[in-house]
Amino acid sequence: MNRDTLKQIMIDQKDIYLNNPLITRQYFLETNVNYCFVGIRRTGKSYMMYQQIKQLEADGIPLSQIIYVNFEDERLLEMTAEDLNLILEIGLEISETDIKPYLFLDEIQNINGWEKFVRRIADMKYRINITGSNSKMLSSEIASTLGGRFVIMNIYPYSFSEYLIANNMTKNYLDVISTKDRADVQNQYNKYVTYGDTEEDKQEIAAIDHI
């Protein structure tokens, strides 16, 4: 993997989590824990990472100390496990500090042999979060694969209450009493069961509504 190409990809991808609108999910997360976010595609695993990054930023961690790589990027198709350490090297170069950066590796299962890398980085006391959605990542064996170094967090599609919050309806839908509010909730429920209940589905619905 060409080092300069990888560095450019990392810089490009920073805009993804900086500019993506964030809807906080109803999961309790700690910033001093290594997480492995698993779940079917389109349930918002990446957004859990964005949520973690926003919390670190709120806690005063400079963005230069945050490394985010999404391995769905087609420019990374030829990347191998041997190249993964370049991510850490480039991250340390960008941060211009000896302080260990936080790593967020999205859909890392796309790289064969990724397991040894993340175990080694965790053993070196880096804070690292990963996501995955293939059959191996979703299996009960993932905990043993990661050797107890990560908390496995299963991410599920939106509940209906989360879906309402994502669509700017902050009222408790169980307490809705006016005719208009009932109609609004029914309209959202129809979309929820028709189009889907994931973060990406919510964005697609918003796009449809603006057509």
Language-model segments: residues:
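Interdomain motor-coupling "hinge/lid" segment immediately C-terminal to the ATP-binding subdomain
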Residues: 2-14, 141-211
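Pre-Walker A adenine-sensing motif
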Residues: 13-32
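Hydrophobic anchor at the beta1->P-loop junction of P-loop NTPases
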Residues: 37
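Walker A (P-loop) phosphate-binding loop of P-loop NTPases
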Residues: 41-42
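Conserved lysine of the Walker
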Residues: 45-46
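Short glycine-rich substrate-engagement loop in P-loop NTPases that contacts/grips substrate
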Residues: 67-101
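Structural recognition of the conserved hydrophobic beta-strand(s) that form the central parallel beta-sheet
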Residues: 127-133, 154, 163
